Amino acid sequence: MSMLEQMGKAAKQASWQLAMLSTAKKNQALAVIANLLESESQAILQANEQDMAAARDSGMSEALLDRLLLSPARLAAIANDVRQVCRLNDPVGRVIDGSLLDSGLKLERRRVPLGVIGVIYEARPNVTIDVASLCLKTGNAVILRGGKETHHTNQATVKVIQQALEQCGLPPAAVQAIESPDRELVTQLLRMDNYIDMLIPRGGAGLHKLCREQSTIPVITGGIGVCHTFVDESADFEKALLVIENAKIQRPSACNSLETLLVHQEIAARFLPILSDRMHAFGVTLHASPQAMPFLAEGKARVVAVEAADYDDEWLSLDLNVEIVADINAAISHIREHGTSHSDAILTRSLGNAEHFVRAVDSSAVYVNASTRFTDGGQFGLGAEVAVSTQKLHARGPMGLDALTTYKWIGYGDDLVRS
């Protein structure tokens, strides 16, 4: 039996035990994890420093370095996220619906854990803890495969999680990590459908494509965020600029940050010079369409010509595409062609245009007069998210606790037989 098969078998056995746990027991384990993350923070941060040093030496981009970094403040926030998961309602055992049938059978549909979750991710050390906490809360075991960039950080955090599980009398195999950087192990993992019930990739487009094409396990894809905001002709300029600032500048490396701004042609001459000045203050480079270029050049920001391929890629940096569109339908057409079904927004004072945009844009999250940065499990009140799904089955948008469960039908009878 291979190393991966041994992990899969241990995870499956652990999942049976987890499925039987009370909410109180699961919360106890999560509380111990949060406490140990703080008490063992020095070891985790030192491990992260090793990963950061190696990443810098390899020439990793600033956007990815930001994703890789664990600061004391970020680690403290992650520990608090685990405590927030403790406070969330446990979906396991919840009766979704039920009825008494004419046959006398009392039928109900009840939420249950999925079983074993596999998660493949890249330079995102927070994923280790976020995913583990959500899986434990929902009674699922998890096998993690982080990128080589996060090797030392993942080792340190999984060690803390397994220590907490043992302290609570739970199987450490409930949370396991594949430590070898061998890429062949990813291919093997994708075919372990006899042990793993759902696979979640969190990384670039290449990883998602690999999982879709080679996995024999049901895959939840998403997280690629070419997010748009359309500034309608009725938008309030100052309020619109505040939303754009938040969406682009708060955390440019996040998948829900703004990548392309679409501006109605009727306001372009007045709005774009102001936008250019505002973006200059934050060091944003504007990638302008030929129509937008002269208006943006009136402001102070650095402006370069947009390339056709720019509309289809995430910048994950202080760069923003700017395009002028004829009307709301042209904006919708642009989003349909270049969007990734993640998060898109309209800034408008027209109720009719707002409703038209919401109905026409087929993304997992659509906003009216709000920043795309809200697409987040914590912001949605779901707790730490396991991923943002941009597909329509089995989950869509930020995946919280409910998305890590399925359901079973349970029938109660009094020695009933079918007639």
From Swiss-Prot:
Pathway: Amino-acid biosynthesis; L-proline biosynthesis; L-glutamate 5-semialdehyde from L-glutamate: step 2/2. It is an enzyme of class 1 (oxidoreductase). CDD domains: ALDH_F18-19_ProA-GPR (cd07079). One of its GO terms (cellular component) is cytoplasm. It is found in: Cytoplasm. Keywords: Amino-acid biosynthesis, Cytoplasm, NADP, Oxidoreductase, Proline biosynthesis. Pfam families: Aldedh (PF00171). PROSITE patterns: PROA. GO terms for molecular function: glutamate-5-semialdehyde dehydrogenase activity; NADP binding. It catalyses: L-glutamate 5-semialdehyde + phosphate + NADP(+) = L-glutamyl 5-phosphate + NADPH + H(+). It comes from the Bacteria. Its EC number is 1.2.1.41. One of its GO terms (biological process) is L-proline biosynthetic process. Catalyzes the NADPH-dependent reduction of L-glutamate 5-phosphate into L-glutamate 5-semialdehyde and phosphate. The product spontaneously undergoes cyclization to form 1-pyrroline-5-carboxylate. Belongs to the gamma-glutamyl phosphate reductase family. This is Gamma-glutamyl phosphate reductase. The lineage of its organism: Bacteria, Pseudomonadati, Pseudomonadota, Gammaproteobacteria, Enterobacterales.
